[in-house]
């Protein structure tokens, strides 16, 4: 240790996704938390601190094939936090450990951080970039309703629709008939 600098990192950021793609992903990750399907975090946090649970939480869960490791990554527009659950010898965890145990731990941790520094998670909301195109698409196809020709017969493809976000000006494509693509 003679004081010589061996290495100094120089940050050279590279944009990987467009703003539209990034904000669409944020919208998708909001559903991971709010749906409560893969994690009880939202329910646990609501029980512990209802006002903090109203923050704009997005997140991603993860589990290895044999349940040796489980993750929960959480974010608000202001702060990101990740938690891991597992054994150092790769023994499997109980089924549902990520859904319940890690989620509960993370809810208590988030609340403890909030108690130590009130307002740290912020009140900001994630929002879609103005370049995002919204399209009404069929639930069944993910494409816009339309007409297709099958064996010379024109068929109207319609049904229930949902809003779909696109990172292109054109938005969703119109339904087409292509059998055995690939």
Cite the ranges covered by each PLM segment.
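A conserved catalytic-loop motif detector
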Residues: 1-61, 65
């Amino acid at each position: 240790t003679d004081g010589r600098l061996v290495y100094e990192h120089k940050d050279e950021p590279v944009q990987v996704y467009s703003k539209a793609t990034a904000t669409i992903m944020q919208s998708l990750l909001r559903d991971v938390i709010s749906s409560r399907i893969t994690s009880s975090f939202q329910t646990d946090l609501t029980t512990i601190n209802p006002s903090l649970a109203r923050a704009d939480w997005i997140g991603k869960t993860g589990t290895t094939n044999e349940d040796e490791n489980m993750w929960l990554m959480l974010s608000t527009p202001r702060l990101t936090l990740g938690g891991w659950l597992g054994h150092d010898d790769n023994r499997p965890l109980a089924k549902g450990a990520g859904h319940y145990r890690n989620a509960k731990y993370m809810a208590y941790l988030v609340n403890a951080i909030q108690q130590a520094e009130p307002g740290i998670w912020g009140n900001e909301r994630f929002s879609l970039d103005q370049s995002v195109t919204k399209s009404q698409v069929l639930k069944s196809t993910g494409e816009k309703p339309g007409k297709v020709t099958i064996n010379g017969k024109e068929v109207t493809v319609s049904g229930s629709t949902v809003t779909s976000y696109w990172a292109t000006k054109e938005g969703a494509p119109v339904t087409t008939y292509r059998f055995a693509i690939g």
